Amino acid sequence: MLIWLVELSEYFKFLNLFRYITFRTGAALFTSALIVFLFGPTIINSLRIRQGKGQPIRADGPQTHFKKAGTPTMGGLMILAGIVGASLLWADLSNVYVVATLLVTLGFGAIGFYDDYLKVTKQSHKGFSGKARLGIEFVIAGIAVYFMMRTALASGTAGSTFGSSIAFPFFKDFLINLGIMFVVFGGFVIVGAGNAVNLTDGLDGLAIVPVMIAAASFGVIAYLAGNVVFANYLQINFVPGTGELAVVLGAVIGAGLGFLWFNAPPAAIFMGDTGSLALGGTIGTVAVATKHEIVMAIIGGLFVMETLSVIIQVGFFKMTGRRVFLMAPIHHHFEKKGWTESQVVIRFWIIAVGLALLGLSTLKLR
């Protein structure tokens, strides 16, 4: 919104700063963190009063988790407030990619909020119907992908079918055109990302730091892909307008830092599905917009690992009646093996950093 003040730069030279994505990204980070810091305590106290028993604790989970009983959930409301508030101030709201990303952020956040509400009121792990939840997620993601695809097709910078094509790392000109089916592919990427982060969010600080790492990585990718000079130099696909997504991701990082202040062990609040679905969906949307869906599987490899552990556990149990892991998602497996919560969290953070660096290195390998 504040970018519109650039028109007054003829009279106030300092307003030229608002032209620069880097400046607005930093400002969005600071603003979102400030929003969470300022309103966090009020939101936490309100949720604690309203929820009473807080988030239900799994009876079959690690024994150390029972001491967390009574901790309120829905902390994602703080994160959403920071992201949306900062984005409205600092991002270009006429940019289709920004609007599509915020649509997914808010839409997935609303789904997560309803899921959290059902779990808290029923004091049960069974919230929103899985099929209904996935169906609504696909509708929201599909709408976002459709409009982003149309925008990319209209730009025509890399051919008439670029917007509906999958790009591959290491090969700039190797594109597979999916046509209208790209909406399905993109929707799958976004929904998968949202639910992968949701599965990872099981320990204090476990999900939010890897999300910030992924957001920082994709902030770099979005900025480079949206700049024709850098894109040509690195031989990555130029996608006009995606640079503006760096501002939104700056807001994600700021909101994440603010939330981590309250989520650090012992957590005063959990983000719940409200936050995890929204954050994962946001990262997934940026990956689709920048044509780095495959690279997201590397940068977000930790989330992929968590998701695969659940798929393997459920599938193997249905076939054999036995379990591969002591408990899934896999972070609980390591807890059951005797790792402390802090050991699991910090070691997984290290993995996330390594995977992010590996993913970013693909930008130069052409």
Swiss-Prot record:
Alphabetical UniProt keywords: Cell cycle, Cell division, Cell inner membrane, Cell membrane, Cell shape, Cell wall biogenesis/degradation, Magnesium, Membrane, Metal-binding, Peptidoglycan synthesis, Transferase, Transmembrane, Transmembrane helix
Alphabetical list of NCBIfam families matching this protein: mraY
Encoding gene, per UniProt annotation: mraY
PROSITE patterns the UniProt entry points to: MRAY_1 (PS01347), MRAY_2 (PS01348)
Organism name: Rhizobium etli (strain ATCC 51251 / DSM 11541 / JCM 21823 / NBRC 15573 / CFN 42)
Enzyme Commission code: 2.7.8.13
Function: Catalyzes the initial step of the lipid cycle reactions in the biosynthesis of the cell wall peptidoglycan: transfers peptidoglycan precursor phospho-MurNAc-pentapeptide from UDP-MurNAc-pentapeptide onto the lipid carrier undecaprenyl phosphate, yielding undecaprenyl-pyrophosphoryl-MurNAc-pentapeptide, known as lipid I.
Record flagged with keyword Chaperone: no
Topology versus the membrane: Multi-pass membrane protein
GO cellular component, one term: plasma membrane
Cofactor: Mg(2+)
Family stated for the protein in its record: Belongs to the glycosyltransferase 4 family. MraY subfamily.
Name this polypeptide is given: Phospho-N-acetylmuramoyl-pentapeptide-transferase
HAMAP family assigned to the protein according to its UniProt record, in alphabetical order: MraY
Pathway linked to the protein: Cell wall biogenesis; peptidoglycan biosynthesis
Protein location: Cell inner membrane
Top EC class of this enzyme: transferase
